[in-house]
A protein has these predicted regions:
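Secondary-structure boundary/capping residues
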Residues: 35, 54, 82, 90, ...
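Generic secondary-structure boundary/loop-capping signal
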Residues: 27, 42, 49, 62, ...
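Metal-dependent enolase-superfamily TIM-barrel catalytic cores that perform enediolate-based chemistry
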Residues: 92-200
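Short, well-ordered coil loops that connect the C-terminus of an alpha-helix to the N-terminus
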Residues: 32, 79, 87, 154-155, ...
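Generic structural signal for individual residues within well-ordered alpha-helical segments
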Residues: 39-42, 85, 109, 172
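Glycine-rich, aromatic-flanked loop segments that form ligand/cofactor-binding clefts
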Residues: 66-102
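Metal- or metallocofactor-binding catalytic centers and their adjacent structured scaffolds
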Residues: 2-76
């Protein structure tokens, strides 16, 4: 900012592409501009990066700059950013353990129990298999969920992430098999663009 305040913004999943978009496109747009003009700058960045697509590196770069603008605003006002956004709306923010990556059933069970001991009442695991693994993969996915459910009991919420690896047909079959385990949610069974697929599921 003109007052010498630096804002910090972070892009997750940083890749060479994100760095390139940040340095060669986004930074050239916002350099010397008024960081309090967040909406105008956001619109400018969004338009300038449209040839790069509306997902991935371009949006990550824009997001990092937007966060930095908010960081500057908070520092200038001597307030936390959440106060600038209207203040707290709750006394607590729910969180969950999100690192249950199946390697084998014993390790998965041990990790799940460690999360319970650490005080988590919700945890998310990953599936190992998609349609290419056929019925055997379905059985193994179910067995992994069963391992976690048996380990933590019914009072702990379990979610699971397919990371866009399923087809609609496979997802519907898999979700039918998993219904008895009372999962809190199944994340990204198909790609985000498949709106009709999500409606079908």
């Amino acid at each position: 900012s003109e007052g010498g305040i630096a804002g910090v913004g972070v892009a997750e999943w940083v890749s060479g592409a994100t760095e390139t978009v940040s340095e060669e496109t986004v930074s050239t747009l916002v350099g010397g501009e008024d960081p309090s003009q967040r909406e105008r700058m956001g619109d400018m960045m969004y338009r300038a990066t449209s040839p790069f697509g509306r997902k991935g590196a371009a949006v990550e770069a824009i997001s990092a700059v937007d966060v930095a603008f908010w960081d500057i605003a908070g520092k200038e006002a001597d307030k936390r950013v959440y106060e600038l956004l209207g203040g707290p709306v709750t006394d607590e923010i729910p969180c969950y353990a999100s690192n249950l990556h199946p390697v084998d059933h014993e390790k998965l069970e041990r990790e799940a129990l460690e999360y319970v001991e650490a005080g988590f009442d919700t945890m998310k695991m990953r599936f190992l298999h998609g349609p290419e693994a056929g019925r055997k993969g379905m059985r193994e996915n179910e067995a992994l969920v069963e391992t976690v459910r048996d380990a933590v009991g019914d009072d702990i919420a379990i979610a699971a992430d397919a990371y866009m690896g399923w087809s609609v047909r496979y997802a519907k079959k898999m979700l039918d098999r998993l219904e008895r385990y009372d999962l809190a949610w199944v994340e990204e069974p198909v790609i985000p663009d498949d709106i009709d697929g999500y409606a079908d599921i």
